[in-house]
Amino acid sequence: MIQLENIEKHYESKKRRVIGVDQVSLDIKKGEIYGIVGYSGAGKSTLLRCMNVLERPTKGRVFVDGIDLLELNNKQLRKARQSIGMIFQGFYLVSSKTVVENVSFALKAAGVGKLERNKRALELLNLVGIEDKANQYPSQLSGGQKQRVSIARALANNPKVLLCDEATSALDPSTTKSILKLLKKINEQIGITIVIITHEMEVVKEICDRCAVMQNGKVIENGKTYDIFSDPNEKLTKDFIHTVLDFQLPEALLKQCNGTLLKLQFRGDIAAESVVSDMLQQHKVKGNILHGKVEYIKDKPLGVFIMEVSGDPSEISSAISYLEERIKQVEVIQHVSY
């Protein structure tokens, strides 16, 4: 649905050139929810704005639904943008207009008649769950309700793509979850492709099928969300994931441990209890699981357990080798010499 080919965006000044996006290529599939995560200044919002040419790339090509947007004239580009909805952190609602008028405004700009505008706007407010707020003004709404109006407005012209620029960063955790749930519902009901820009890995974990990690204008890692979480390659990616999957043991508990500490990661359908039980039966070691947690990413389990193992060093070494064969990801956190 969206193909970016070697996108670069430069900002020139008298003193220096700033590179906002640096040779980024992405292929975002039709109907998926794609996340782009990075810290402030990573270039993710600039990249998102290149997707609908609100920012014109310095180099590269942008295809949306097979159309090269950079080859269009201004009139053609305005027409093409009707198939690309966009929501922002700041909502940008017209304070002097009611909720239904804010949604209708996008339809009016597209030349839709008044009766049809009103009907469509009410349908969209029903879709996003605030049909009862139709005649209220933005000042009477909560932050989550305002974002729902923004989503309804962005969907007014039946777009094929919805771009979300930090759409939940101004919301509290509970409201964020409700907005993400709404976006997922919309994706499932109408099959719209959604691209989400965020600095929160929790957002990516919650709804994204695939994701990319940006740093200094570059995409440093990308792939299926589950694979990124279960086997990250880059340090920045690992740092982001630790904000969601924090399995660190308290220092006081670490000091009480006399054996070798292992961090075991279980993916998919591998049963942690079975693997650990088999290991203890086949090796002359004692084991004690100190901490464990299972997260579900796109309905697939990802488990991490901290285990203390004690016994003869050679048996411990053999037990670790056995675990590595069964579950692949085994990390020795603390090794005790006997």
Swiss-Prot record:
EC main group: translocase
Cellular-component GO terms for this entry: plasma membrane
Primary location class: membrane
Chain residues that bind ATP: G38, Y39, S40, G41, A42, G43, K44, S45
Coiled coil: none
Keyword annotations from UniProtKB, A to Z: Amino-acid transport, ATP-binding, Cell membrane, Membrane, Nucleotide-binding, Translocase, Transport
Keyword Lipoprotein: no
Translocase listed as a keyword: yes
Entry's Gene Ontology molecular function annotations: ABC-type D-methionine transporter activity; ATP binding; ATP hydrolysis activity
CDD domains referenced in this protein's UniProt entry, alphabetically: ABC_MetN_methionine_transporter
Membrane disposition: Peripheral membrane protein
EC number: 7.4.2.11
Every ABC transporter domain range: 2-241
Catalytic activity: L-methionine(out) + ATP + H2O = L-methionine(in) + ADP + phosphate + H(+); D-methionine(out) + ATP + H2O = D-methionine(in) + ADP + phosphate + H(+)
Cell location: Cell membrane
Transmembrane segments: none
Pfam families in the cross-refs: ABC_tran, NIL
Sequence similarity: Belongs to the ABC transporter superfamily. Methionine importer (TC 3.A.1.24) family.
Function: Part of the ABC transporter complex MetNIQ involved in methionine import. Responsible for energy coupling to the transport system.
Assembly and oligomerization: The complex is composed of two ATP-binding proteins (MetN), two transmembrane proteins (MetI) and a solute-binding protein (MetQ).
Protein name in the entry: Methionine import ATP-binding protein MetN 1
Organism for this UniProt entry: Oceanobacillus iheyensis (strain DSM 14371 / CIP 107618 / JCM 11309 / KCTC 3954 / HTE831)
High-level lineage: Bacteria, Bacillati, Bacillota, Bacilli, Bacillales
